[in-house]
Regions:
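C-terminal subdomain of the subtilisin-like protease fold in secreted/lumenal serine endopeptidases
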Residues: 240, 291-404
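Substrate-binding/access-modulating region of protease and related hydrolase catalytic domains
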Residues: 141-221, 268-271
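N-terminal domain-start motif of subtilase-like serine proteases
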Residues: 44-75, 99-106, 324
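Hydrolase catalytic cores
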Residues: 137, 254-323
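Active-site-adjacent substrate-recognition loops and nearby beta-strands
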Residues: 60, 206-226, 230-247, 258-271, ...
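Structural recognition of the beta-strand scaffold that forms the well-ordered cores
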Residues: 74-78, 131-136, 170, 175-180, ...
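Subtilisin-like serine protease catalytic core
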Residues: 64-75, 81-95, 103-155, 224, ...
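Secretory targeting and sorting signals
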Residues: 1-43
Length: 405
């Protein structure tokens, strides 16, 4: 899968594959580039709920009628540019929080706008009243470019690297983060970013891929606690393009989805796990609204225990089965264990529970922490006090693990 977003036209999935810069090494810097103005979508170029099969499949009209809209929940996406002038998004609460200036291609804007619309469109979004924070990540192979300010790095990672953007979303208060792209990036910085999410109760959803193969090693879903999402059709069957792997936790409808193609100014039909992933993120937002006293761990327990596989058993193709919004909105998760059911995905998934506790206790080397405004070092390494590369507060010897009774 490589560092590619998962946009897959129905008849040319492999040919449409894009490569996203996920690390400083992959980022192409273009001097003097600024964000291009967004051209308004044509007023008559509209997409309705009836055009989106998933809307009827998940009975989202009934959810809205009962007041389940995701109101009060903040979702983030790390993706292409979102065109908020698209008719279906004009009433949505969307905020571009990109960390630097990125010029998006028509292809990237098509992808980002589609993902955002599935989440919060007032017309056919899963969680239409959630607030959406958007963070642009460039795809150089499609003509995206980033301003020189994006190259300012910490620990060798740019402001458009995956750890930086995920942490920025958490800095800005996101409760759920959707990542409809691939990332084979390893390293401590991403590990501690995921550990932060697990510690702070932020749920990350990630697309499994569209290459009809085991893509665990190139999906963010390989990481402990991340909700990997594969794709089914409205017949409930796994789609032939959908990838699989140890990180898959659930599955959702991946298409066909209608979206604006900004290269042709036409409405096109497409499919992919890029679109099943935000459906899951949106349903989790509905559950977060419905069950405000539940922890993130309990919401994930709810996801697992209401999965549509027989007896909620797990397999690498559909995880615990298709997501069931109706069951998630009827079943009180506060009675479920406050333990993340995805914390150990087997095969040595990372971060381990011990590593998550290291982060929570503040004993992780701060030189491995990137763009995290919540972390403070509380270990005993005095050399870190004077280290100019340390950007987080240091409070030596104050870790709770040293003072536990």
């Amino acid at each position: 899968m490589g560092p590619a977003p998962m946009v897959k036209p129905r008849r040319a999935r492999r040919k449409s594959r894009r490569v996203w810069g996920a690390s400083a090494a992959a980022l192409v810097i273009a001097a003097g580039v600024t964000t291009l103005p967004t051209a308004p979508a044509q007023a008559d170029n509209t997409i309705s709920a009836a055009d989106q099969p998933y809307f009827a499949y998940y009975h989202l009209d009934q959810a809205r009628a009962k007041g389940y809209t995701g109101k009060g929940v903040t979702i983030a996406i790390v993706d292409g540019e979102v065109d908020t002038t698209a008719p279906e998004l004009r009433e949505s609460d969307i905020h571009d929080k990109s960390t630097c200036e990125v010029t998006s291609s028509a292809s990237s804007k098509t992808h980002g706008t589609a993902v955002a619309s599935i989440l919060v469109s007032s017309v056919y979004g899963v969680a239409p009243e959630s607030s959406l924070l958007t963070y642009q990540i460039p795809a150089p192979s499609r003509g995206d470019s980033a301003s020189p300010s994006c190259a300012e790095t910490q620990n060798g990672l740019s402001k458009v690297s995956v750890p930086w953007l995920l942490n920025q979303a958490m800095n800005d208060g996101a409760q759920i983060v959707n990542f409809s792209a691939s990332s084979s990036l390893q390293g401590d910085e991403l590990k501690w970013t995921v550990a932060r999410a697990l510690t702070k109760g932020v749920i990350i959803t990630a697309a499994a891929g569209n290459e009809a193969m085991d893509e665990n090693s190139s999906s963010l879903s390989q990481w402990s606690g991340v909700v990997g999402v594969s794709a089914i059709g409205v017949d409930g069957n796994r789609q032939d393009y959908s990838s699989w792997g140890q990180g898959v936790a659930t599955t959702a409808v991946g298409g066909p989805v209608k979206t604006h193609d900004f290269a042709t100014n036409q409405i096109v039909e497409t499919s992919g796990t890029s679109f099943s992933s935000p459906i899951v993120a949106g349903v989790l937002a509905l559950a977060r609204q419905k069950w405000p006293n539940a922890t993130a761990n309990q919401l994930l327990q709810l996801l697992v225990k209401t999965g549509l596989n027989p007896d909620h058993t797990w397999n690498q193709y559909t995880g615990y089965g298709g997501i069931d919004p109706g069951a998630m909105l009827k079943t009180d998760p506060t009675t479920l264990p406050d333990v993340n059911p995805l914390a150990d995905k087997g095969n040595g998934s990372s971060p381990t529970p011990d590593e998550v506790q290291q982060y929570a206790d503040g004993v992780v080397n701060p030189l491995q922490i990137v763009n995290d405004n919540s972390y403070a070092y509380r270990g005993f390494d005095e050399s870190l006090i004077a280290d100019p590369m340390v950007t987080v507060p240091t409070h030596l010897g104050t870790s709770p693990r040293y003072h536990a009774k």
